[in-house]
């Protein structure tokens, strides 16, 4: 079994926030792969799905971002899931909008959700870094990630989540490079190969 974790904050107040793109990705995967109904478990919302030939536990921690590791650690212990089988979907300021990078281990880049998971579970889990762009000034980051995606951003967010869901079976099978490439090609095919953050001017 693999564990797919989407990071975000619980409740309608945060549902459309840039920081919640991990939740959005998991919701899209659950819909596409006809996952079981979400239920309260492991200090979050949990579901199960079969992606390709792999059984996958889907988890959206409801601990708030800074305590995400508590939910991940509980689910990991219950199912005895190895850290190498844990995949975390999260927002990434250091990637432009629509850009996706998959990596194992590495730093937390100031992301409190990743910091919590690393502290409680270890560092060698997989990250699916979902680019949201950077506001350009460190002082603006907090407000930027806790604001909703702008109306103009919603089309690429929806297409990104659809592409992640379409190719999630590759990720479940451990084919991370193929997954990343397929998602990139899907977004490129929909015209999202040079998306700027809202407010940025085209070069």
Curated annotation (Swiss-Prot):
Residues bound to tRNA: 14, 64, 66, 112
CDD domains: PTH (cd00462)
A single Gene Ontology CC term: cytoplasm
Entry keyword tRNA-binding: yes
Site feature: Stabilizes the basic form of H active site to accept a proton: 91
GO BP annotation list: protein quality control for misfolded or incompletely synthesized proteins; rescue of stalled ribosome
InterPro entries: Pept_tRNA_hydro (IPR001328), Pept_tRNA_hydro_CS (IPR018171), Pept_tRNA_hydro_sf (IPR036416)
Oligomeric form and interacting partners: Monomer.
Name of this chain's protein: Peptidyl-tRNA hydrolase
Organism listed in the record: Methylobacterium nodulans (strain LMG 21967 / CNCM I-2342 / ORS 2060)
Native organism taxonomy: Bacteria, Pseudomonadati, Pseudomonadota, Alphaproteobacteria, Hyphomicrobiales
Protein encoded by which gene: pth
């Amino acid at each position: 079994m693999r564990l797919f974790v989407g990071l975000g904050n619980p409740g309608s107040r945060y549902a459309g926030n840039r920081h919640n793109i991990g939740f959005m990705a998991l919701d899209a995967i659950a819909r596409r792969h006809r996952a079981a109904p979400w239920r309260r478990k492991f200090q979050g919302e949990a579901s199960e799905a079969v992606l390709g030939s792999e059984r996958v536990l889907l988890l959206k921690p409801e601990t708030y971002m800074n305590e995400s590791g508590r939910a991940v650690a509980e689910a990991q212990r219950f199912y005895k899931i190895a850290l190498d089988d844990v995949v975390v979907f999260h927002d990434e300021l250091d990637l432009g909008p629509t850009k996706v990078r998959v990596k194992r281990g590495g730093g937390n880049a100031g992301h409190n959700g990743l910091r919590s998971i690393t502290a409680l579970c270890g560092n060698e889990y997989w990250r699916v870094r979902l680019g949201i762009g950077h506001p350009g000034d460190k002082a603006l980051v907090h407000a930027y990630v806790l604001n909703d995606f702008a109306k103009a951003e919603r089309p690429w967010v929806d297409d990104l989540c659809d592409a992640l869901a379409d190719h999630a079976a590759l990720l479940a099978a451990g084919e991370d490079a193929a997954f990343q490439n397929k998602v990139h090609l899907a977004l490129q095919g929909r015209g999202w190969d040079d998306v700027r953050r809202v407010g940025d001017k085209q070069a």
